[in-house]
């Protein structure tokens, strides 16, 4: 019985191995669809809890930069997220995030540090890369 259990565990670990875009090995235990749904659900909850910015100009600015980044995602990764959505949250937090399922959150406080579109693009590109590299799936 113990050998069967160990064999099953070894098979599971081999089946769950994946490689990130950087070539690093990953242990992926959940399907991309499951993790994407968790990201979508979390984002919906966050939108209910956090104040969303009403500044249309800044929202368009963030959306424009995010669109430019998403447009450059290689075709081989575009299948993992079909629709990216950006929300600008009205908060002094100097932060941004991206969740599985293609949801990007940016806090207005980020503009204290990101003074131009190149700096914003660096932050958003970093966050999008987390999604493409399936980092959330590794953490589950």
Regions found by a protein language model. Give the residues of each.
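C-terminal motif of bacterial Sec signal peptides marking the signal peptidase cleavage site
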Residues: 13-16
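Peri-catalytic and regulatory segments of divalent metal-dependent proteins
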Residues: 18-140
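Short, isolated positions within intrinsically disordered regulatory regions of eukaryotic proteins
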Residues: 8-9, 88
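Bacterial N-terminal signal peptides that target proteins for export
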Residues: 1-8
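Polar low-complexity intrinsically disordered regions enriched in Ser/Thr and small residues
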Residues: 10-11, 26
């Amino acid at each position: 019985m113990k050998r069967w259990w160990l064999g099953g565990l070894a098979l599971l670990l081999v089946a769950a191995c994946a490689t990130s875009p950087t070539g690093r090995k990953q242990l992926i235990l959940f399907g991309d669809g499951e993790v994407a749904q968790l990201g979508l659900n979390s984002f919906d909850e966050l939108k209910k809890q956090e104040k969303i910015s009403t500044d249309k100009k800044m929202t368009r600015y963030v959306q424009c930069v995010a669109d430019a980044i998403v447009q450059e995602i290689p075709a081989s990764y575009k299948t993992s997220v079909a629709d990216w959505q950006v929300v600008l949250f009205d908060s002094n937090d100097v932060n941004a995030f991206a969740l599985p399922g293609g949801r990007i959150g940016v806090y207005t406080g980020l503009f204290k540090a990101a003074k131009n579109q190149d700096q914003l693009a660096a932050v958003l590109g970093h966050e999008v890369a987390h999604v493409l590299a399936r980092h959330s799936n590794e953490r589950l």
